[in-house]
C-alpha cells in the first residue's frame, strides 16, 4: 500500500507522481495499491492513477479513505474503468457503502485488528 508523500516533497500531482513512481519502480514484482486519504492534504485523482498505471503494471488497485463521496468517485472514475483493478474500502464506517454501492472487493480497516474474525465474516 502506497501512501502519499506530503512532508518533504509537497502535495502537487508532479511531486506525488515522482514519489509513487520511485516506490513502484523499486519493487516492480510486488502488487501495489495506492492509499488515498484526503486528510493527508492530497487526493489522488483518476488522471494521476492512470498515468502511473501506464508505466507500472504492478499497480493493481486503490484504497479509499476519504469517505462515501470519495469512495463513489474512486469506483466511478478509477476501478470501474478496468475489470482487473481492485477497490478497497479504508474507512470502517463506509464498508457497507463500499461493497453495496461501489463494488469494493475488500476492506483494510482499523477494526479488523481488534475483531479479525468478525471482519472476515463480513
Can you say where each PLM-predicted feature lies in the sequence?
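Glycine-rich, proline-tolerant flexible connector loops at the mouths of alpha/beta enzymes
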Residues: 1-17
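Short beta-strands and strand-loop turn motifs
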Residues: 1-5, 30-36
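Catalytic alpha/beta core domains of metabolic enzymes, predominantly
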Residues: 22-30, 37-122
Amino acid at each position: 500500500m502506497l501512501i502519499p508523500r506530503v512532508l518533504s516533497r509537497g502535495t502537487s500531482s508532479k511531486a506525488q507522481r515522482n514519489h509513487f513512481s520511485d516506490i513502484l519502480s523499486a519493487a516492480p514484482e510486488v502488487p501495489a495499491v495506492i492509499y488515498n486519504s484526503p486528510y493527508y492534504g492530497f487526493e489522488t485523482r483518476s488522471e494521476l492513477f492512470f498515468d502511473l498505471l501506464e508505466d507500472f503494471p504492478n499497480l493493481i488497485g486503490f484504497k479509499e479513505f476519504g469517505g462515501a463521496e470519495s469512495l463513489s468517485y474512486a469506483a466511478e472514475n478509477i476501478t470501474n474503468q478496468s475489470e482487473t483493478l481492485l477497490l478497497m474500502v479504508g474507512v470502517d464506517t463506509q464498508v457497507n457503502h463500499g461493497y453495496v454501492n461501489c463494488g469494493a472487493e475488500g476492506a483494510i480497516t482499523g477494526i479488523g485488528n481488534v475483531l479479525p474474525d468478525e471482519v472476515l465474516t463480513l
